């Protein structure tokens, strides 16, 4: 459950810290839909598979790996890797990648300032991000790779030899 709680806390944190960045939205001809909005934040997958380009702009949070370790004479530690996939749209070949970079740098700045999310998940380094150079305009994609230390599960069984 802990990685799911991390995703929930990250979703709230990112929504709160990016809500003022309005991004271009692709509109269908003849519709009266919004032309700008903040990126929507999703966990593990987009809600409608057939309409992925209509979801843009978005930030998709995905747990990639998790591990619990205990080195000799050390307390247990847990770690989860989370990938944040960011997609933006723009007809302007300069503004699209800049909007993408702006979102990535905002998330980077706010996460590194706060460092702890939900009172229990600690950001670890390295903090990595990439802007994909081979994306097809008018869609621009990038991602952030993060590592988080997470609480571990403790044994509930009492030691018999005590």
Regions found by a protein language model. Give the residues of each.
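Small/polar-rich, solvent-exposed N-terminal microdomains that initiate assembly or binding
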Residues: 1-71, 159-162
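Ordered, soluble secondary-structure elements with a strong preference for glycine-centered loop motifs
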Residues: 4, 94-101
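Catalytic micro-motifs at enzyme active sites that drive phosphoryl/nucleotidyl and oxygen chemistry
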Residues: 48, 67-74, 127-137
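A general secondary-structure signal for short beta-strands and their flanking turns/coil
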Residues: 56, 75-81, 137-143
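Generic internal hydrophobic packing segments that stabilize the cores of diverse globular domains
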Residues: 58, 81, 100-104
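Active-site-adjacent structural patch at catalytic or cofactor/ligand-binding sites
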Residues: 61-91
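Residue-level signal for secondary-structure boundary sites
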Residues: 69, 90-94, 152-156
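Acidic-leaning, charged glycine-interspersed low-complexity segments
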Residues: 98-162
């Amino acid at each position: 459950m802990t990685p799911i709680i991390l995703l929930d806390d990250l979703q709230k944190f990112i929504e709160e810290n990016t809500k003022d960045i309005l991004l271009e939205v692709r509109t269908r001809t003849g519709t009266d839909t919004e032309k700008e909005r903040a990126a929507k934040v999703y966990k593990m997958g987009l809600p409608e598979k057939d309409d992925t380009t209509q979801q843009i702009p978005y930030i998709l949070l995905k747990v990639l790996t998790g591990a619990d370790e205990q080195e000799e004479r050390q307390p247990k530690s847990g770690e989860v890797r989370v990938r944040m996939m960011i997609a933006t749209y723009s007809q302007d070949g300069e503004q699209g990648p800049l909007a993408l970079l702006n979102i990535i740098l905002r998330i980077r700045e706010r996460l590194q300032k706060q460092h702890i999310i939900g009172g229990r998940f600690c950001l670890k380094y390295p903090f990595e991000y990439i802007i994909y150079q081979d994306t097809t305009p008018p869609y621009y994609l990038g991602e952030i790779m993060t590592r988080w230390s997470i609480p571990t599960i403790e044994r509930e069984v009492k030691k018999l030899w005590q």
